[in-house]
Amino acid sequence: MQTNIAAEVLQLCRERGLTLAAAESCTGGLIAKELTDIPGASQVFLGGVVSYTNHVKEQVLRVPAALLERCGAVSAPVARAMALGARVLTGADLALSVTGLAGPDGDDRGNPVGTVFTALAAPEGVFVEQLALGGDRAQIRALSAHHALDMARRYLTHQITEGE
């Protein structure tokens, strides 16, 4: 993944006086890694949570157990709850989240490998997008992290305006 999008997101946040956090599942910290590869990231990026299990989603991000049971971990409502949880936990102005299936298998709800949900929690609301990605595990993880960062970039450049 290229770090230029991470640098652009950090610069846009810096210019607007905004802070950023992340809640990651299938990306396993790739968003945080891309952001912290950039010198000065600590002025903007407050931190991230790798919530690889439902237990951590529940206990750290406060994703309701009933939501996980009803919708499954790989779903728009859970991506939304993860982003909100990261925003509350860190006090960040913006929080990204990613949950999905990087492979090698789909889930018991019929979601195939490459099903990914990204979300951005902002003061105006929460924006959620669904992806259907191809590639191997590493490619799906990298594309998911890149898409989440691009989602932040699009929000910061007013290309996303309708949140829940």
Regions found by a protein language model. Give the residues of each.
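Short alpha-helical segments enriched in small residues
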Residues: M1-E164
